[in-house]
Protein backbone atom coordinates (compact mmCIF):
# COMPACT_ATOMS: atom_id res chain seq x y z
CA UNK A 1 0.00 0.00 0.00
CA UNK A 2 1.31 3.43 -0.95
CA UNK A 3 2.14 5.66 2.01
CA UNK A 4 0.74 9.22 1.73
CA UNK A 5 3.51 11.74 2.25
CA UNK A 6 1.93 14.57 4.23
CA UNK A 7 5.28 16.18 5.07
CA UNK A 8 7.77 17.44 2.50
CA UNK A 9 10.67 19.90 2.40
CA UNK A 10 11.21 23.30 0.82
CA UNK A 11 13.41 23.28 -2.25
CA UNK A 12 13.12 26.81 -3.66
CA UNK A 13 11.74 30.19 -2.54
CA UNK A 14 10.85 33.10 -4.84
CA UNK A 15 8.97 35.73 -2.85
CA UNK A 16 5.42 34.52 -2.18
CA UNK A 17 5.92 31.44 -4.41
CA UNK A 18 7.77 28.45 -2.93
CA UNK A 19 8.52 24.95 -4.24
CA UNK A 20 8.34 21.81 -2.08
CA UNK A 21 9.38 18.21 -2.83
CA UNK A 22 8.63 14.78 -1.30
CA UNK A 23 5.02 15.82 -0.71
CA UNK A 24 1.76 14.28 -1.91
CA UNK A 25 -0.74 17.04 -2.68
CA UNK A 26 -3.73 17.91 -4.84
CA UNK A 27 -4.34 21.22 -6.56
CA UNK A 28 -5.54 23.94 -4.16
CA UNK A 29 -4.67 21.94 -1.01
CA UNK A 30 -3.85 24.17 1.96
CA UNK A 31 -0.33 23.58 3.30
CA UNK A 32 1.70 24.85 6.27
CA UNK A 33 5.07 26.17 5.12
CA UNK A 34 8.32 26.32 7.13
CA UNK A 35 9.00 26.18 10.86
CA UNK A 36 6.60 29.09 11.39
CA UNK A 37 3.70 27.15 9.78
CA UNK A 38 2.83 29.86 7.24
CA UNK A 39 -0.41 29.26 5.38
CA UNK A 40 -0.11 28.48 1.67
CA UNK A 41 -2.05 26.91 -1.19
CA UNK A 42 -0.89 24.50 -3.90
CA UNK A 43 -1.26 26.26 -7.27
CA UNK A 44 0.84 24.10 -9.59
CA UNK A 45 2.16 20.53 -9.62
CA UNK A 46 5.08 19.79 -11.92
CA UNK A 47 6.37 16.24 -11.54
CA UNK A 48 7.81 15.97 -8.03
CA UNK A 49 7.75 19.75 -7.56
CA UNK A 50 4.77 21.12 -5.65
CA UNK A 51 4.47 24.87 -6.23
CA UNK A 52 2.76 26.81 -3.45
CA UNK A 53 1.60 30.43 -3.11
CA UNK A 54 2.06 31.59 0.48
CA UNK A 55 -0.52 33.90 2.06
CA UNK A 56 2.01 35.40 4.48
CA UNK A 57 5.40 37.08 4.26
CA UNK A 58 8.09 34.49 3.37
CA UNK A 59 11.18 36.47 4.42
CA UNK A 60 13.49 34.41 6.63
CA UNK A 61 12.38 30.93 5.55
CA UNK A 62 15.02 28.74 3.87
CA UNK A 63 15.29 25.56 1.76
CA UNK A 64 15.16 22.40 3.83
CA UNK A 65 12.39 23.61 6.15
CA UNK A 66 9.34 21.32 6.45
CA UNK A 67 6.09 21.66 4.49
CA UNK A 68 2.97 19.97 5.83
CA UNK A 69 -0.14 19.20 3.78
CA UNK A 70 -3.45 19.59 5.61
CA UNK A 71 -5.33 17.77 2.84
CA UNK A 72 -8.06 20.44 2.88
CA UNK A 73 -8.86 23.07 0.28
CA UNK A 74 -9.04 26.76 1.24
CA UNK A 75 -12.44 27.03 2.93
CA UNK A 76 -14.43 29.54 4.95
CA UNK A 77 -16.49 28.92 8.06
CA UNK A 78 -20.14 29.81 7.46
CA UNK A 79 -22.52 30.28 10.38
CA UNK A 80 -23.77 32.75 13.01
CA UNK A 81 -21.21 35.42 13.87
CA UNK A 82 -20.31 36.44 10.30
CA UNK A 83 -22.19 39.74 10.42
CA UNK A 84 -20.31 42.66 12.06
CA UNK A 85 -17.04 40.72 11.55
CA UNK A 86 -13.87 42.23 10.13
CA UNK A 87 -11.62 39.68 8.43
CA UNK A 88 -8.34 39.62 6.58
CA UNK A 89 -8.14 37.91 3.16
CA UNK A 90 -8.12 34.36 4.55
CA UNK A 91 -10.98 34.83 7.05
CA UNK A 92 -8.89 35.45 10.14
CA UNK A 93 -10.90 37.83 12.37
CA UNK A 94 -8.80 40.96 12.87
CA UNK A 95 -10.37 41.69 16.26
CA UNK A 96 -9.17 38.29 17.55
CA UNK A 97 -5.71 38.80 16.02
CA UNK A 98 -5.38 42.18 17.81
CA UNK A 99 -6.00 40.45 21.15
CA UNK A 100 -3.45 37.76 20.30
CA UNK A 101 -0.59 39.94 19.10
CA UNK A 102 -1.36 43.66 19.11
CA UNK A 103 -1.79 45.97 16.13
CA UNK A 104 0.56 44.23 13.70
CA UNK A 105 -0.17 40.78 12.33
CA UNK A 106 2.63 38.34 13.02
CA UNK A 107 3.29 35.37 10.76
CA UNK A 108 1.98 31.88 11.25
CA UNK A 109 -0.85 32.92 13.57
CA UNK A 110 -4.18 31.25 12.92
CA UNK A 111 -7.61 32.03 14.31
CA UNK A 112 -10.95 30.45 13.41
CA UNK A 113 -13.26 32.61 11.29
CA UNK A 114 -16.14 32.30 13.79
CA UNK A 115 -16.21 32.17 17.59
CA UNK A 116 -16.49 28.52 18.66
CA UNK A 117 -17.26 29.42 22.31
CA UNK A 118 -20.15 31.87 21.92
CA UNK A 119 -23.62 30.40 22.33
CA UNK A 120 -26.48 31.29 19.97
CA UNK A 121 -30.21 30.83 20.53
CA UNK A 122 -31.41 28.32 17.91
CA UNK A 123 -35.13 28.11 17.01
CA UNK A 124 -36.08 25.14 14.82
CA UNK A 125 -38.63 25.66 12.04
CA UNK A 126 -38.69 21.97 11.03
CA UNK A 127 -39.67 19.05 13.24
CA UNK A 128 -38.72 15.38 13.60
CA UNK A 129 -40.00 13.34 10.66
CA UNK A 130 -39.79 16.21 8.14
CA UNK A 131 -38.02 15.43 4.88
CA UNK A 132 -35.07 17.77 4.18
CA UNK A 133 -32.81 18.12 1.16
CA UNK A 134 -29.47 19.94 0.68
CA UNK A 135 -29.95 23.69 1.29
CA UNK A 136 -33.24 23.31 3.24
CA UNK A 137 -33.55 25.84 6.06
CA UNK A 138 -34.14 23.98 9.35
CA UNK A 139 -34.00 26.80 11.90
CA UNK A 140 -33.18 30.40 12.73
CA UNK A 141 -30.80 32.39 14.92
CA UNK A 142 -31.44 36.08 15.69
CA UNK A 143 -27.91 37.27 14.92
CA UNK A 144 -28.36 41.06 14.79
CA UNK A 145 -31.64 42.56 13.59
CA UNK A 146 -31.05 40.13 10.69
CA UNK A 147 -32.25 36.57 11.14
CA UNK A 148 -29.51 34.06 10.38
CA UNK A 149 -31.08 31.00 8.76
CA UNK A 150 -29.47 27.63 9.48
CA UNK A 151 -29.51 25.28 6.51
CA UNK A 152 -28.65 21.70 5.65
CA UNK A 153 -25.16 21.99 4.06
CA UNK A 154 -25.30 21.61 0.25
CA UNK A 155 -22.93 18.59 0.39
CA UNK A 156 -25.29 16.67 2.74
CA UNK A 157 -27.59 13.92 1.43
CA UNK A 158 -31.37 14.26 1.66
CA UNK A 159 -33.08 12.50 4.55
CA UNK A 160 -35.73 12.67 7.26
CA UNK A 161 -35.06 14.56 10.50
CA UNK A 162 -34.50 12.05 13.30
CA UNK A 163 -33.92 14.60 16.05
CA UNK A 164 -33.82 18.43 16.16
CA UNK A 165 -33.00 20.53 19.24
CA UNK A 166 -33.99 23.97 20.47
CA UNK A 167 -32.04 26.28 22.82
CA UNK A 168 -28.56 27.83 23.21
CA UNK A 169 -25.69 26.09 21.43
CA UNK A 170 -22.20 26.82 20.15
CA UNK A 171 -21.71 26.59 16.39
CA UNK A 172 -19.96 23.18 16.72
CA UNK A 173 -22.69 21.41 18.69
CA UNK A 174 -24.97 19.05 16.78
CA UNK A 175 -28.46 20.55 16.57
CA UNK A 176 -30.03 18.12 14.11
CA UNK A 177 -29.50 14.51 13.06
CA UNK A 178 -30.97 12.85 9.97
CA UNK A 179 -32.03 9.23 9.53
CA UNK A 180 -29.13 8.71 7.08
CA UNK A 181 -26.65 9.41 9.91
CA UNK A 182 -25.84 13.00 8.87
CA UNK A 183 -25.21 15.38 11.78
CA UNK A 184 -25.85 19.10 11.28
CA UNK A 185 -24.32 21.91 13.33
CA UNK A 186 -24.97 25.65 12.98
CA UNK A 187 -21.69 26.05 11.10
CA UNK A 188 -20.39 24.38 7.97
CA UNK A 189 -17.31 24.93 5.83
CA UNK A 190 -17.29 25.62 2.11
CA UNK A 191 -14.33 25.75 -0.35
CA UNK A 192 -13.96 29.34 -1.60
CA UNK A 193 -13.19 28.48 -5.22
CA UNK A 194 -16.36 26.43 -5.68
CA UNK A 195 -19.64 28.30 -6.42
CA UNK A 196 -22.46 27.25 -4.08
CA UNK A 197 -25.23 25.30 -5.87
CA UNK A 198 -28.65 26.81 -6.69
CA UNK A 199 -31.89 25.48 -8.19
CA UNK A 200 -31.87 27.92 -11.11
CA UNK A 201 -30.61 31.33 -12.16
CA UNK A 202 -33.29 33.92 -12.86
CA UNK A 203 -33.50 36.93 -15.14
CA UNK A 204 -32.42 40.00 -13.13
CA UNK A 205 -35.50 42.25 -13.49
CA UNK A 206 -35.58 44.19 -10.18
CA UNK A 207 -33.26 47.21 -9.85
CA UNK A 208 -30.85 47.65 -6.96
CA UNK A 209 -32.02 51.04 -5.67
CA UNK A 210 -28.90 52.92 -4.61
CA UNK A 211 -30.29 56.38 -3.85
CA UNK A 212 -27.71 57.88 -6.24
CA UNK A 213 -29.63 59.77 -8.93
CA UNK A 214 -27.20 59.19 -11.80
CA UNK A 215 -27.12 55.43 -11.10
CA UNK A 216 -30.83 54.81 -10.47
CA UNK A 217 -31.96 57.33 -13.04
CA UNK A 218 -29.64 56.82 -15.98
CA UNK A 219 -27.53 53.67 -15.48
CA UNK A 220 -29.36 51.24 -13.17
CA UNK A 221 -27.93 47.89 -12.08
CA UNK A 222 -30.27 44.96 -11.40
CA UNK A 223 -30.29 42.89 -8.23
CA UNK A 224 -28.06 39.98 -9.14
CA UNK A 225 -26.30 42.10 -11.75
CA UNK A 226 -22.67 43.05 -12.25
CA UNK A 227 -21.25 46.56 -12.45
CA UNK A 228 -17.76 48.00 -12.82
CA UNK A 229 -16.56 51.37 -11.56
CA UNK A 230 -13.30 52.18 -13.34
CA UNK A 231 -11.61 55.50 -12.77
CA UNK A 232 -8.25 57.16 -12.20
CA UNK A 233 -6.93 58.05 -8.75
CA UNK A 234 -8.96 60.61 -6.83
CA UNK A 235 -12.06 60.34 -9.02
CA UNK A 236 -14.23 58.97 -6.21
CA UNK A 237 -14.29 55.16 -6.66
CA UNK A 238 -14.07 54.43 -2.95
CA UNK A 239 -16.58 57.15 -1.96
CA UNK A 240 -19.04 55.80 -4.57
CA UNK A 241 -18.51 52.22 -3.32
CA UNK A 242 -19.04 53.35 0.27
CA UNK A 243 -22.20 55.29 -0.68
CA UNK A 244 -23.51 52.09 -2.32
CA UNK A 245 -22.62 50.04 0.75
CA UNK A 246 -24.49 52.53 2.96
CA UNK A 247 -27.59 53.20 0.88
CA UNK A 248 -28.29 50.38 -1.59
CA UNK A 249 -31.41 48.39 -0.74
CA UNK A 250 -29.51 45.12 -0.35
CA UNK A 251 -30.12 43.39 2.99
CA UNK A 252 -26.49 42.31 3.44
CA UNK A 253 -23.33 44.11 2.33
CA UNK A 254 -19.95 42.40 1.88
CA UNK A 255 -17.15 44.95 1.42
CA UNK A 256 -13.77 43.68 0.21
CA UNK A 257 -10.88 46.13 0.47
CA UNK A 258 -8.57 44.28 -1.88
CA UNK A 259 -5.07 45.78 -2.03
CA UNK A 260 -6.28 49.33 -1.42
CA UNK A 261 -4.60 52.00 0.73
CA UNK A 262 -4.50 51.20 4.44
CA UNK A 263 -5.90 54.63 5.30
CA UNK A 264 -9.01 54.03 3.18
CA UNK A 265 -9.62 50.73 4.94
CA UNK A 266 -9.13 52.48 8.30
CA UNK A 267 -11.78 55.00 7.24
CA UNK A 268 -14.21 52.18 6.43
CA UNK A 269 -13.41 50.33 9.67
CA UNK A 270 -13.96 53.43 11.81
CA UNK A 271 -16.91 54.89 9.85
CA UNK A 272 -19.07 51.82 9.24
CA UNK A 273 -19.57 50.88 12.92
CA UNK A 274 -20.82 54.44 13.60
CA UNK A 275 -23.12 54.75 10.57
CA UNK A 276 -26.83 54.22 10.96
CA UNK A 277 -28.77 51.98 8.62
CA UNK A 278 -31.42 54.39 7.21
CA UNK A 279 -34.05 51.64 7.06
CA UNK A 280 -33.77 50.28 10.62
CA UNK A 281 -31.94 53.00 12.57
CA UNK A 282 -29.48 50.33 13.77
CA UNK A 283 -25.70 50.48 13.15
CA UNK A 284 -24.91 49.72 9.49
CA UNK A 285 -22.23 47.29 10.66
CA UNK A 286 -24.98 44.88 11.78
CA UNK A 287 -25.67 43.93 8.15
CA UNK A 288 -22.08 44.14 6.93
CA UNK A 289 -19.09 41.82 6.59
CA UNK A 290 -15.78 43.62 6.00
CA UNK A 291 -12.72 42.00 4.47
CA UNK A 292 -9.66 44.20 4.90
CA UNK A 293 -6.68 43.27 2.81
CA UNK A 294 -4.50 46.34 2.36
CA UNK A 295 -1.77 46.97 -0.21
CA UNK A 296 1.07 46.13 2.19
CA UNK A 297 -0.33 42.67 2.99
CA UNK A 298 1.09 39.71 1.02
CA UNK A 299 -0.10 39.78 -2.60
CA UNK A 300 -1.28 36.17 -2.71
CA UNK A 301 -3.93 36.90 -0.08
CA UNK A 302 -5.64 39.36 -2.46
CA UNK A 303 -6.91 36.52 -4.60
CA UNK A 304 -8.10 34.68 -1.49
CA UNK A 305 -9.92 37.80 -0.21
CA UNK A 306 -11.99 38.08 -3.41
CA UNK A 307 -13.04 34.42 -3.26
CA UNK A 308 -13.66 34.57 0.51
CA UNK A 309 -15.95 37.57 0.01
CA UNK A 310 -18.01 36.05 -2.81
CA UNK A 311 -18.44 32.76 -0.89
CA UNK A 312 -19.77 34.60 2.18
CA UNK A 313 -22.10 36.59 -0.14
CA UNK A 314 -23.41 33.36 -1.74
CA UNK A 315 -24.08 31.90 1.72
CA UNK A 316 -26.37 34.81 2.64
CA UNK A 317 -27.96 34.62 -0.82
CA UNK A 318 -28.85 30.98 -0.07
CA UNK A 319 -30.84 32.21 2.96
CA UNK A 320 -33.00 34.25 0.56
CA UNK A 321 -31.33 37.63 1.10
CA UNK A 322 -30.32 40.25 -1.46
CA UNK A 323 -26.58 40.77 -1.04
CA UNK A 324 -24.39 43.43 -2.58
CA UNK A 325 -20.67 42.78 -2.78
CA UNK A 326 -18.19 45.63 -3.25
CA UNK A 327 -14.71 44.67 -4.44
CA UNK A 328 -12.31 47.60 -4.16
CA UNK A 329 -10.29 47.11 -6.27
CA UNK A 330 -10.14 44.22 -8.75
CA UNK A 331 -7.07 45.82 -10.42
CA UNK A 332 -4.98 45.10 -7.33
CA UNK A 333 -6.08 41.47 -7.51
CA UNK A 334 -5.09 41.36 -11.20
CA UNK A 335 -1.69 42.86 -10.28
CA UNK A 336 -1.24 40.11 -7.68
CA UNK A 337 -2.04 37.54 -10.40
CA UNK A 338 0.55 39.18 -12.64
CA UNK A 339 3.20 39.05 -9.92
CA UNK A 340 2.57 35.40 -9.09
CA UNK A 341 2.40 34.48 -12.77
CA UNK A 342 5.82 36.03 -13.36
CA UNK A 343 7.23 34.18 -10.31
CA UNK A 344 5.90 30.97 -11.87
CA UNK A 345 7.76 31.93 -15.07
CA UNK A 346 4.58 31.66 -17.15
CA UNK A 347 4.34 33.21 -20.59
CA UNK A 348 3.05 36.77 -20.07
CA UNK A 349 0.04 38.07 -21.97
CA UNK A 350 -0.89 41.67 -22.69
CA UNK A 351 0.97 44.19 -20.47
CA UNK A 352 2.49 41.32 -18.51
CA UNK A 353 -0.84 40.02 -17.20
CA UNK A 354 -1.28 36.23 -17.39
CA UNK A 355 -3.17 34.73 -20.33
CA UNK A 356 -5.89 33.49 -17.94
CA UNK A 357 -6.75 37.01 -16.64
CA UNK A 358 -10.11 37.09 -18.49
CA UNK A 359 -11.02 33.59 -17.27
CA UNK A 360 -10.33 34.46 -13.61
CA UNK A 361 -12.27 37.72 -13.80
CA UNK A 362 -15.28 36.07 -15.44
CA UNK A 363 -15.11 33.21 -12.90
CA UNK A 364 -15.55 35.83 -10.17
CA UNK A 365 -18.23 38.02 -11.81
CA UNK A 366 -20.27 35.03 -13.00
CA UNK A 367 -20.91 34.05 -9.38
CA UNK A 368 -23.25 37.05 -9.20
CA UNK A 369 -26.91 36.51 -10.07
CA UNK A 370 -30.50 36.44 -8.93
CA UNK A 371 -31.37 32.85 -8.12
CA UNK A 372 -33.97 30.41 -6.93
CA UNK A 373 -32.13 28.85 -3.97
CA UNK A 374 -32.09 25.17 -2.97
CA UNK A 375 -34.71 26.12 -0.34
CA UNK A 376 -36.92 27.55 -3.16
CA UNK A 377 -36.43 31.15 -1.93
CA UNK A 378 -35.30 34.08 -4.07
CA UNK A 379 -31.90 35.60 -3.32
CA UNK A 380 -29.33 37.61 -5.20
CA UNK A 381 -25.67 38.64 -5.20
CA UNK A 382 -24.92 41.93 -6.96
CA UNK A 383 -21.20 42.40 -7.63
CA UNK A 384 -19.82 45.93 -7.97
CA UNK A 385 -16.11 45.91 -8.77
CA UNK A 386 -13.90 48.99 -8.75
CA UNK A 387 -11.14 49.04 -11.36
CA UNK A 388 -8.10 51.34 -11.00
CA UNK A 389 -6.55 51.65 -14.47
CA UNK A 390 -3.06 53.21 -14.31
CA UNK A 391 -3.27 56.80 -15.53
CA UNK A 392 -7.02 56.46 -16.10
CA UNK A 393 -6.42 54.50 -19.32
CA UNK A 394 -9.57 52.47 -20.01
CA UNK A 395 -7.90 50.54 -22.83
CA UNK A 396 -5.70 48.52 -20.44
CA UNK A 397 -6.41 44.76 -20.11
CA UNK A 398 -8.15 44.67 -16.70
CA UNK A 399 -10.71 47.34 -17.69
CA UNK A 400 -11.28 45.83 -21.13
CA UNK A 401 -11.73 42.28 -19.83
CA UNK A 402 -14.04 43.52 -17.08
CA UNK A 403 -16.14 45.39 -19.67
CA UNK A 404 -16.65 42.19 -21.62
CA UNK A 405 -18.16 40.53 -18.54
CA UNK A 406 -20.19 43.19 -16.70
CA UNK A 407 -23.46 44.65 -17.98
CA UNK A 408 -23.23 47.97 -16.21
CA UNK A 409 -20.35 50.40 -16.63
CA UNK A 410 -20.02 53.51 -14.46
CA UNK A 411 -17.05 55.42 -15.88
CA UNK A 412 -15.53 57.83 -13.37
CA UNK A 413 -13.90 60.90 -14.86
CA UNK A 414 -11.02 62.84 -13.27
CA UNK A 415 -12.05 66.01 -15.15
CA UNK A 416 -15.48 65.94 -13.53
CA UNK A 417 -13.97 65.44 -10.07
CA UNK A 418 -11.60 68.37 -10.70
CA UNK A 419 -14.69 70.48 -11.52
CA UNK A 420 -16.12 69.28 -8.18
CA UNK A 421 -18.92 67.40 -9.93
CA UNK A 422 -19.71 64.37 -7.74
CA UNK A 423 -20.47 61.53 -8.24
CA UNK A 424 -17.90 62.01 -11.03
CA UNK A 425 -19.59 59.48 -13.33
CA UNK A 426 -19.28 60.45 -16.97
CA UNK A 427 -22.79 60.17 -18.48
CA UNK A 428 -21.40 59.94 -22.04
CA UNK A 429 -19.05 56.99 -21.45
CA UNK A 430 -21.20 55.02 -18.99
CA UNK A 431 -23.92 52.56 -19.96
CA UNK A 432 -26.27 49.96 -18.52
CA UNK A 433 -27.52 46.92 -20.42
CA UNK A 434 -30.25 46.30 -17.83
CA UNK A 435 -32.53 49.10 -19.07
CA UNK A 436 -34.79 46.84 -21.15
CA UNK A 437 -35.27 44.22 -18.43
CA UNK A 438 -35.92 46.87 -15.75
CA UNK A 439 -38.31 49.09 -17.77
CA UNK A 440 -41.38 47.11 -16.66
CA UNK A 441 -40.43 47.53 -12.99
CA UNK A 442 -40.14 51.31 -13.42
CA UNK A 443 -43.47 51.47 -15.26
CA UNK A 444 -45.24 49.62 -12.44
CA UNK A 445 -43.44 51.04 -9.39
CA UNK A 446 -42.41 54.59 -10.30
CA UNK A 447 -44.45 55.90 -13.24
CA UNK A 448 -45.22 54.97 -16.86
CA UNK A 449 -43.59 58.33 -17.73
CA UNK A 450 -40.24 57.30 -16.19
CA UNK A 451 -38.66 55.54 -19.19
CA UNK A 452 -39.51 58.30 -21.74
CA UNK A 453 -38.21 60.90 -19.23
CA UNK A 454 -34.92 59.06 -18.84
CA UNK A 455 -34.50 58.80 -22.62
CA UNK A 456 -35.24 62.53 -22.97
CA UNK A 457 -32.63 63.44 -20.31
CA UNK A 458 -29.96 61.34 -22.05
CA UNK A 459 -30.76 62.93 -25.43
CA UNK A 460 -30.42 66.46 -23.97
CA UNK A 461 -27.06 65.59 -22.37
CA UNK A 462 -25.78 64.09 -25.65
CA UNK A 463 -26.94 67.14 -27.60
CA UNK A 464 -25.10 69.38 -25.13
CA UNK A 465 -21.88 67.41 -25.67
CA UNK A 466 -22.20 67.91 -29.45
CA UNK A 467 -22.80 71.67 -29.00
CA UNK A 468 -19.95 72.05 -26.51
CA UNK A 469 -17.29 72.17 -29.26
CA UNK A 470 -19.05 75.08 -31.00
CA UNK A 471 -19.57 76.87 -27.65
CA UNK A 472 -15.85 76.63 -26.87
CA UNK A 473 -15.01 78.16 -30.26
CA UNK A 474 -17.56 80.97 -30.58
CA UNK A 475 -19.39 81.19 -27.23
CA UNK A 476 -22.98 80.21 -26.44
CA UNK A 477 -24.44 83.57 -27.58
CA UNK A 478 -23.63 82.70 -31.21
CA UNK A 479 -25.90 79.64 -31.09
CA UNK A 480 -29.50 79.67 -32.34
CA UNK A 481 -32.09 80.38 -29.61
CA UNK A 482 -33.33 76.77 -29.43
CA UNK A 483 -29.83 75.44 -28.85
CA UNK A 484 -29.16 78.06 -26.16
CA UNK A 485 -32.21 76.71 -24.33
CA UNK A 486 -30.92 73.13 -24.82
CA UNK A 487 -27.62 74.11 -23.17
CA UNK A 488 -29.50 75.72 -20.25
CA UNK A 489 -31.69 72.61 -19.75
CA UNK A 490 -28.60 70.37 -19.89
CA UNK A 491 -26.90 72.57 -17.27
CA UNK A 492 -29.95 72.15 -15.03
CA UNK A 493 -29.86 68.37 -15.53
CA UNK A 494 -26.17 68.29 -14.63
CA UNK A 495 -26.31 70.58 -11.61
CA UNK A 496 -29.71 69.65 -10.18
CA UNK A 497 -30.17 66.00 -11.13
CA UNK A 498 -26.72 64.47 -11.66
CA UNK A 499 -24.73 66.25 -8.95
CA UNK A 500 -25.26 64.84 -5.49
CA UNK A 501 -23.67 65.67 -2.16
CA UNK A 502 -22.62 62.45 -0.38
CA UNK A 503 -22.03 64.38 2.85
CA UNK A 504 -25.42 66.14 3.06
CA UNK A 505 -27.85 64.25 5.35
CA UNK A 506 -30.78 64.67 2.92
CA UNK A 507 -29.10 64.69 -0.50
CA UNK A 508 -26.90 61.65 0.16
CA UNK A 509 -29.94 59.41 -0.54
CA UNK A 510 -32.65 60.26 -3.06
CA UNK A 511 -35.60 57.90 -3.48
CA UNK A 512 -37.12 57.08 -6.87
CA UNK A 513 -40.22 59.28 -6.39
CA UNK A 514 -38.10 62.34 -5.65
CA UNK A 515 -35.84 61.56 -8.63
CA UNK A 516 -38.90 61.35 -10.87
CA UNK A 517 -40.35 64.63 -9.52
CA UNK A 518 -37.05 66.51 -10.03
CA UNK A 519 -36.71 65.21 -13.61
CA UNK A 520 -40.34 66.04 -14.31
CA UNK A 521 -39.87 69.63 -13.06
CA UNK A 522 -36.82 70.09 -15.34
CA UNK A 523 -38.78 68.61 -18.27
CA UNK A 524 -41.66 71.01 -17.48
CA UNK A 525 -39.25 73.97 -17.65
CA UNK A 526 -37.86 72.65 -20.96
CA UNK A 527 -41.32 72.25 -22.57
CA UNK A 528 -42.43 75.69 -21.38
CA UNK A 529 -39.15 77.25 -22.59
CA UNK A 530 -39.54 75.90 -26.16
CA UNK A 531 -43.21 76.99 -26.21
CA UNK A 532 -42.17 80.49 -25.07
CA UNK A 533 -39.52 80.65 -27.82
CA UNK A 534 -42.17 79.88 -30.44
CA UNK A 535 -44.33 82.65 -28.95
CA UNK A 536 -41.47 85.09 -29.56
CA UNK A 537 -40.00 85.40 -26.03
CA UNK A 538 -36.27 86.24 -26.09
CA UNK A 539 -33.78 83.65 -24.79
CA UNK A 540 -32.29 85.78 -22.00
CA UNK A 541 -35.75 86.12 -20.41
CA UNK A 542 -36.26 82.33 -20.54
CA UNK A 543 -32.86 81.48 -19.06
CA UNK A 544 -33.18 84.25 -16.47
CA UNK A 545 -36.47 82.90 -15.07
CA UNK A 546 -36.50 83.47 -11.29
CA UNK A 547 -38.48 80.38 -10.23
CA UNK A 548 -36.01 77.90 -11.74
CA UNK A 549 -33.25 79.24 -9.46
CA UNK A 550 -35.15 77.74 -6.49
CA UNK A 551 -35.11 74.26 -8.04
CA UNK A 552 -31.55 73.23 -6.94
CA UNK A 553 -32.55 73.73 -3.26
CA UNK A 554 -35.13 70.93 -3.58
CA UNK A 555 -32.28 68.40 -3.24
CA UNK A 556 -31.66 69.47 0.36
CA UNK A 557 -35.31 69.52 1.50
CA UNK A 558 -36.71 66.36 3.08
CA UNK A 559 -40.43 67.16 2.74
CA UNK A 560 -40.01 68.53 -0.77
CA UNK A 561 -43.46 67.89 -2.35
CA UNK A 562 -45.18 71.22 -1.44
CA UNK A 563 -42.01 73.14 -2.34
CA UNK A 564 -41.62 71.57 -5.81
CA UNK A 565 -45.33 72.12 -6.54
CA UNK A 566 -44.94 75.81 -5.58
CA UNK A 567 -41.88 76.18 -7.87
CA UNK A 568 -43.66 74.53 -10.84
CA UNK A 569 -46.74 76.78 -10.36
CA UNK A 570 -44.56 79.90 -10.12
CA UNK A 571 -42.67 78.83 -13.27
CA UNK A 572 -45.95 78.33 -15.11
CA UNK A 573 -47.26 81.79 -14.15
CA UNK A 574 -43.91 83.45 -15.04
CA UNK A 575 -43.92 81.76 -18.47
CA UNK A 576 -47.56 82.81 -19.02
CA UNK A 577 -46.62 86.45 -18.29
CA UNK A 578 -43.64 86.23 -20.67
CA UNK A 579 -45.81 84.81 -23.48
CA UNK A 580 -48.47 87.48 -22.94
CA UNK A 581 -45.85 90.26 -22.94
CA UNK A 582 -44.37 88.90 -26.20
From Swiss-Prot:
Any one biological process term the GO annotation gives: proton motive force-driven plasma membrane ATP synthesis
GO cellular component, one term: plasma membrane
Compartmental location: Cell membrane
Protein name (database record): A-type ATP synthase subunit A 1
Catalytic reactions on record: ATP + H2O + 4 H(+)(in) = ADP + phosphate + 5 H(+)(out)
Subunit field text: Has multiple subunits with at least A(3), B(3), C, D, E, F, H, I and proteolipid K(x).
Membrane topology: Peripheral membrane protein
Disulfide bonds: none
Record's keyword annotation contains Lipid metabolism: no
Pfam family, one: ATP-synt_ab
Annotated positions binding ATP: 231-238
Metal-binding recorded as keyword: no
Amino acid sequence: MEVKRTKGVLKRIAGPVVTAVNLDAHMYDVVKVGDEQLMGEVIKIKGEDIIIQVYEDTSGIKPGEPVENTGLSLSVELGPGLLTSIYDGIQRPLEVLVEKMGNFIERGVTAPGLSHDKKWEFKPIKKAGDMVTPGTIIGEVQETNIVHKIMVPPYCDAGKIKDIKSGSFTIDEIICTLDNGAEIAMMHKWPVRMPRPVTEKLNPDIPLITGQRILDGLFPVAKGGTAAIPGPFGSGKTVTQQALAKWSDAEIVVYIGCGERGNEMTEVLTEFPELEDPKTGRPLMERTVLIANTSNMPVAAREASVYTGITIAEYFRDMGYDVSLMADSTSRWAEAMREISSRLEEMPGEEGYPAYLAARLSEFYERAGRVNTLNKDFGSVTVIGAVSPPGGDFSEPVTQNTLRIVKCFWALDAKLSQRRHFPAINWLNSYSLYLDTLSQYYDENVSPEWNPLRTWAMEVLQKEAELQEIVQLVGSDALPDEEQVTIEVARMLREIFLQQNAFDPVDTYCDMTKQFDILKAIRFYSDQAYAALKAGVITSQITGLKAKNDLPQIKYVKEYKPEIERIVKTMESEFTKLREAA
